[in-house]
Structures are given as structure tokens and as C-alpha cells.
């Protein structure tokens, strides 16, 4: 039985006969995190400084402190919050660098394989619905999902137990028969506490940055490693 495309740790974890539901993160998991990192760490600070007549580069330190204060909360992920907080048109600024939005390798084939295998595929993201709309428009991934759920619709970030409780209320799933793929260790920790049995992370969410710490979670370099051999295309 061919298994060369799968790492031993992923082969050991993902028994596809034991999985009914696949929950997928968006930014850093299906999509290259380079867009988000560039936007929040470079582009927005630049535009923020320009809007306030500050010297180039001087706005970054202030924004980094503001980001840090909101990390892991719904506010951090909210376009509306940052538009109010910074008095800037965040979505217009995102459009300026939207050419950086890109799908990670083998994602589309993986999504097609999941549908062919009869798995229920749900995009479960902390991204604000405005960001989701932009990225789905740029990537065309929407038809591959049975449902798209933003944490903002549930009023709880994925780092919180309330997110999983509320998700299950609208999207029934058996935690013991569910796979979550996410690049965020705090989110994976939260899902583990909730009881989601199958957890996989991403080694390189941002293609322009080094491999990240994946903790004790099985990790993939790309989605070709996660596809069961019998589902692989050419």
C-alpha cells in the first residue's frame, strides 16, 4: 500500500475511515500567511504613518503594541474594530496588496479529494467576514466547502471553548470523528481541550518565513502529505 507521500506521524494520526468532518482554518493553513503578515506588519503601518504625517517606519512600533494587546481576541481579528480604532479604511488598504493572496500548494486537490470521499468540509476561521469575502473572491475556494463559519458570527474566537460549543450547535460534528487542520497552536490547544481527536498543523504558514514551531502536533509541509494515497490524483 503506497504511503511514501505521508510522514509517519501523519499516517499514524489520520485514519480516514475514522473521520467524518474536516474543519479547516483559512489564513496560514489553506492560504499563504504572507499576505496577512505583510499587510499588518508592513503595509498598514506604512499607511497609518502616512495618514498621520509621521516619519516612515514610525507607526510600526505603536501598531505592534496595539496588536499585542488584542492578540487572541475577536477584536484582533475584526476589520470593523481596526477601522474604528485606527480611523482607516482597512478593506481598501487590503485591496492594495490583494495580489499577495495565494493558495498553498495542493489545497484544491485536497479539497476535491475530501468531497470525493464524502467528508463534510467546513471552513472554520477567526477571520472577519469582510476578509473572508475578499479572500474567497480572490481564490474561488467557496464551492469546495459545505459551510463557512467565522468566529465573529459566533461571538467567540477559536481560542475560546465557547467557539467549539457554538460551532457544534449550528454545524453538528462528533469531536471523536473530526479532523482540524490549523496553523495556530493556541487554537489547536483549544480544540484539544474541547475533545477534537484529530489535530494537524502546518510547518510553514508563511512561505516567506522559516518553518515554525509546531509543538507536539503532527505537522505537514503541504496538503499532498495529508491526502490518503487512494485519493491522490496525478
Language-model-detected regions and their locations in the chain:
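Asp-based, Mg2+/Mn2+-dependent phosphohydrolase catalytic module
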Residues: 1-20, 112, 128-234
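N-terminal helical cap/lid subdomain that shapes the substrate entry/recognition surface
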Residues: 6-109, 130
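Catalytic-core regions built around general acid/base machinery
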Residues: 106-118
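Ser/Thr-centric signal marking residues that sit
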Residues: 29, 125, 178
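Short glycine/serine/threonine/alanine-rich loop segments
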Residues: 54, 88, 119, 173, ...
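Short active-site oxyanion
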Residues: 118-122, 175-178
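Short, flexible loop segments at the rims of nucleotide/cofactor-binding pockets, characterized by
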Residues: 97-102, 126, 155-158
Amino acid at each position: 500500500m503506497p504511503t511514501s507521500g505521508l510522514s509517519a506521524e501523519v499516517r499514524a494520526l489520520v485514519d480516514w475511515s475514522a473521520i467524518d468532518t474536516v474543519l479547516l482554518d483559512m489564513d496560514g493553513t489553506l492560504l499563504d500567511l504572507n499576505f496577512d503578515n505583510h499587510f499588518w506588519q508592513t503595509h498598514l503601518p506604512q499607511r497609518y504613518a502616512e495618514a498621520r504625517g509621521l516619519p516612515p517606519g514610525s507607526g510600526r512600533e505603536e501598531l505592534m503594541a496595539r496588536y499585542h494587546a488584542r492578540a487572541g481576541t475577536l477584536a484582533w481579528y475584526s476589520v470593523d474594530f481596526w477601522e474604528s480604532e485606527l480611523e482607516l479604511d482597512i478593506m481598501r488598504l487590503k485591496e492594495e496588496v490583494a495580489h499577495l493572496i495565494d493558495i498553498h500548494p495542493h489545497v484544491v486537490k485536497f479539497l476535491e479529494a475530501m468531497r470525493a470521499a464524502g467528508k463534510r468540509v467546513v471552513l472554520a476561521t477567526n477571520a472577519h467576514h469582510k476578509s473572508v469575502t475578499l479572500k474567497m473572491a480572490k481564490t474561488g475556494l467557496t464551492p469546495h466547502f459545505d459551510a463557512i463559519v467565522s468566529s465573529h458570527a459566533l461571538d467567540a474566537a477559536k481560542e475560546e471553548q465557547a467557539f467549539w460549543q457554538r460551532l457544534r450547535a449550528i454545524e453538528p460534528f462528533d469531536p471523536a470523528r473530526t479532523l482540524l487542520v490549523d496553523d495556530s497552536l493556541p487554537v489547536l490547544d483549544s480544540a484539544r481541550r474541547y475533545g477534537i481527536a484529530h489535530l494537524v498543523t502546518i510547518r510553514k504558514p508563511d512561505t516567506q518565513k522559516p518553518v515554525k514551531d509546531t509543538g507536539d502536533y503532527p505537522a505537514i509541509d503541504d496538503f499532498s502529505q495529508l491526502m490518503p494515497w487512494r485519493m491522490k490524483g496525478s
